[in-house]
From Swiss-Prot:
Ranges for domain HD: 351-444
E.C. number(s) listed in UniProt: 3.1.-.-
Chain's gene name: rny
Membrane topology listed for this record: Single-pass membrane protein
Protein name as it appears in the record: Ribonuclease Y
GO CC terms of this entry: plasma membrane
Biological role stated in the UniProt entry: Endoribonuclease that initiates mRNA decay.
Domain KH: 225-285
Amino acid sequence: MFEPVATARQRAVACCTFTTEQEDVVQWLVWALPALVIGLAIGAGIGILIYKNSVQSQIRQIEAEARLQLEATRSEQKDLILRATDEALRLRTEAEAQIREARAALAKQEERLQRKEENLDRKIEGLERRERQLQQRERQMEQLHQEAEHLRQQQRAELERISALSQEEARAIILKRVEDETRDEAARRIREIEKTMHEEADKLARKVISMAIQRCASDYVAEVTVSTVALPSEELKGRIIGREGRNIRAFEQLTGVDIIVDDTPEAVTLSCHDPVRREVARLALIKLLKDGRIHPTRIEEVVHKTQQEVDQVMREEGERVAYEANVQGLHPDLIKLLGRLKYRTSYGQNVLQHSLECALLAAHIAAEIGANINVAKTAALLHDIGKAVDHEVQGPHALIGAEIARRLGKSPAIVHAIAAHHNDEEPQTVEAWLVQAVDAISGGRPGARRETLDLYIKRLEALETVATSFSGVQRAFAVQAGREVRVMVQPDAIDDLGSIHLARDVAKKIEESLQYPGQIKVTVIRETRAVDYAR
């Protein structure tokens, strides 16, 4: 395979001639080259062997990883198959359950429909049976009607034969008899019903009103507007009049009040139809007398300041009364008009305190009977608001007050209750009747109001005159300060049932022709006396 080393050396020597150093190098190369070739061959073999071992190791590692991955894939595949199997089983179970529920619901629905159908069939059968019964009853009624008509014809002929009366004459007699019997029966029934109704109503009314009055418990003395101012001395009358009457003219012009200086010792009288202006004049005159400086400029200053003070007092009084009555949301103008009622009186009763008492009573009674409390107490508080301006506007104070309340935003129910509290409008609501009732209770209780002697006597005479204006009345007496009228009737002219009608007619005429506080009781007395003598 290789040539001998000596032969190669000889061939090299033959080819060229070298120096000694070159010969040494060549000789070294000759010896080193084979060794190098051998080393390279050995290294290449070792490298190939190492590379082969490395490749085989990697192949074994890759095969191991592939086997592990294959096993993991197979395990995951098994898990997926198991989960899919479980899910399919669950879905199948749920589907079967839903199918069973749907079948059960369908069966129940079919059962209900079956029952409804059976009930409907029974109802149809019942209706058909009832229809047959009605038809049979109609035939029976028709037969009875024919029999009755036949009997009526027979009776009519018999009556005409017996009484020798015509049909019209017999009908008139029968109708009159039936009318008399019906009237008497109706009067008896009315008396029984009224007796029962009055007993129950009086019992309930006493209970409700007593509870309301006890809870209200208003305690005050009726105020009277003072129009007389006391003077410390008679000399002040001349100072009030002033030089050539300039002081009194300035005072009357600024206040609109007439000052009456007469012979009354140490007093002057203030005269004016407006109680507010009269109060302003009274307070201003008292201040001028205390101050001592009385001249037109000072009078103008004091009157202006007093007007502001009275306006403030009216607002405060209106707010106080609204607060005590627990009525909220009133317009400022309504508050001021309420305050003006402080200076108004009705038969000696202060109108502002009367309105407050009515509001408290209305609230308590409305709570007892289930009426609208807010409407009742608000309408009761404002029911006399028209009296604050009724001298400035023409018309009944109830309608004036209702118009003011409507214009200032009160509800139609409140406006109607105010307008109807003196029957200027027909009461249509429970609250309207309630305001009438509390107005009568507050004004009609003993001591609340008073009348002059002349008015009192005239009212009693008017009551007796109304009662004696009816036929059959013998005498009439007004008793209990005009709160009851006792009517004595002629027993031959009016019977017991006629007494009921007479009492109602007298009460109705009193309501239509007279004005009075509270209510008036009408008692009709029919007395029959049988007298004989034993000899």
